Amino acid sequence: MEYMILIHSDESYEAPTPGTPEFEEFMGAFLAYNQSLIDGGHWISAANLQPSMTATTVRKSFGAASTVVDGPYAESKEQLGGYYVVSAADLDEVIALVEALPIPMASFEIRPIAFRPDAG
C-alpha cells in the first residue's frame, strides 16, 4: 500500500548553512535515509517545499468565484515543509520509517493514498 507522510515543522528552525560541516552532516543523514528507502523498496517520491510565505491559497465555493490569497491555508507555527510518498505493508511499517527520519523536531501526518493515476 502507498502512504503519504506530510512533514509539518516550525519554520523558525534554522537548518545548517550550506557549505558548513553541519550542513554536510545534515544532508548526509537525509541522503542516507533516502537511500535506505530506495534499498528497502519503499521509495516512491519526496520533496522539500519552499517556506509558507511563498504559498498561494485558492479557495473555491460552489457557485461563487474563487478567492486567491497570498500565504498558507492556515496560520500556524508549524507549516507543511515537505513530504514523502512511500510503499509499505501496513501503518506500523510506515511509523517505523517515520521514526527513522533524521528530523529532530516535527509533526508527521501519515495518510494512506486512495488513488494515484500514475501508479502501475
PLM region spans:
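Conserved, structured core segments of small domains
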Residues: 1-120
